[in-house]
């Protein structure tokens, strides 16, 4: 069976070369934490997750700091048993990136996201966002569900794919 273009694009991203990402990572580290991108870097992944090249779709690159989430240490006084230095967030970095994108672009809704690169300090995600007020989105039969009021603030309520994965809702388990 013949393989299409998106298959080969996906194969190229499975083993990215160092030269391909090194200059981009340097630029991304120096840039802002939330940046609107003209087109998705991984077109195959974006199309799989629902991206369409039409009005109303926006791709945002988000930079998330990696590592443990620590609170500042007490300078004086005794620390109680309940108060720990390390904060357990129970959220994966991708969900954090989606929430930050939703906070930065309040008129858009998060559709999905994917990892594009990570280094020792940061993880970079592309978040696909949709403008629910655009007529192109309202008239699209496959995307008009996001205009419904029940899908407002999806990222904050844990309704995106990354949030469901982080909460363990991908598979149904026997709770007996």
For the regions a language model picked out, list residue spans one by one.
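Low-complexity, rRNA-contacting terminal tracts
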Residues: 1-55, 73, 77-176
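Active-site-flanking beta-strand signature of metal-NTP-handling nucleotidyl enzymes
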Residues: 58-62
């Amino acid at each position: 069976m013949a393989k299409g273009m998106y298959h080969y694009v996906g194969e190229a991203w499975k083993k990215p070369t160092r030269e391909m990402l090194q200059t981009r990572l340097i630029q991304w580290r120096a840039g802002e934490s939330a940046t609107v991108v003209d087109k998705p870097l991984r077109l195959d992944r974006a199309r799989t997750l629902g991206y369409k090249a039409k009005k109303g779709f926006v791709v945002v690159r988000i930079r998330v700091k990696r590592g443990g989430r620590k609170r500042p240490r007490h300078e004086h006084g005794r620390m109680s048993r309940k108060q720990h230095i390390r904060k357990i967030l129970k959220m994966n970095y991708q969900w954090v990136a989606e929430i930050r994108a939703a906070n930065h672009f309040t008129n858009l809704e998060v559709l999905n996201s994917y990892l594009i690169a990570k280094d020792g300090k940061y993880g970079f995600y592309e978040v696909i966002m949709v403008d629910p007020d655009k007529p192109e989105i309202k008239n699209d039969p496959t995307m008009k569900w996001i205009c419904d009021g029940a899908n407002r603030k999806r990222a904050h309520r844990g309704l995106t794919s990354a949030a469901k994965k982080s909460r363990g809702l991908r598979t149904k388990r026997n709770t007996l």
